Amino acid sequence: MFETCEAIVMRTVDYGETNKIVTLFTREWGKVAAMARGAKKPSSRLSAVTQPLSYGHYVIRRSRGVGVLHQGELIDSMRALREDLFAAAYAVYIVELTDKSTEEQKRNPYLFELLLQTLQYMSEGRDLEILTFIYEMKMLAVLGIPPVLDRCARCGATEGRFSFSVKEAGFLCHRCEASDPHRFPLSSASVRLLRLFFHIDLARLGSISVKESTKMELGAVLSAYYDEYAGLSLKTKRFLQQIGELKDKLSPDGGQGASFSL
């Protein structure tokens, strides 16, 4: 029986001379794989709808293994993402993070909406790094490894200066920071943003300014935390870091900061 779903194309793998196996992240069923027969042919009606990052409605015959993709209708091709090297790198990274963090056919409409909203914001030209930080923070809850952000992870203090400890899985107050010599010093802006990114409703984004030094603090904390607790091997992570370095060199503002809607 064929069924219709709303989905984002996560990735494709060539199968034979003309076919593709397409992995879709669906609102209705979670992650599913389907055979798209003839999709490698430029003239195929499945060629455009199976491009990575595409968002649309898909008609699938599901099975326990690989189903069959019968047809699709694009809602948003996300062409702007695929045509921009920087945007594509960040978009493919959050898609791979989602892929590696989810099981087959485990429905999660919250995560579907989060991924879709993030990709749409990226496509609109919003700050790629900040959107990625927000997504990474929210994925920590999905992975079951949320850090302690509302208090000191050791003594429970809620006031004062904080640093971030990967070992303690959260903030350390100034009285407890000596317990971790490898802690990450944080500006007050980074402390606020880590909390904000974890809790904010992505649909309510408006406007803030984030200094490059603050971005560097946030990126260092998140990279170290994921390396320690997530257990994920992401091929796109290193490429994303290289892209970030290239973007800094090409930035007309010299990496002084960026404005972003919040």
Curated annotation (Swiss-Prot):
Asked if the Swiss-Prot or TrEMBL record annotates the protein with the keyword DNA damage, the reply is yes
Please provide the Gene Ontology terms (biological process) for this protein. Answer: DNA recombination; double-strand break repair
Pfam assignment, any one: RecO_C
Keywords, comma-separated and alphabetical: DNA damage, DNA recombination, DNA repair
Q: Which GO terms describe its cellular component?
A: bacterial nucleoid
Q: In terms of domain of life, where is this protein from?
A: Bacteria
The record's annotation in InterPro entries points to: ARFGAP/RecO (IPR037278), DNA_rep/recomb_RecO_N (IPR022572), NA-bd_OB-fold (IPR012340), RecO (IPR003717), RecO_C (IPR042242)
Q: HAMAP family attached here?
A: RecO
Q: What role does this protein play?
A: Involved in DNA repair and RecF pathway recombination.
Which NCBIfam families does UniProt cross-reference here?
A: reco
Q: Which family does it belong to?
A: Belongs to the RecO family.
What is the official name of this protein in its record?
Answer: DNA repair protein RecO
The organism encoding this protein is Geobacillus kaustophilus (strain HTA426)
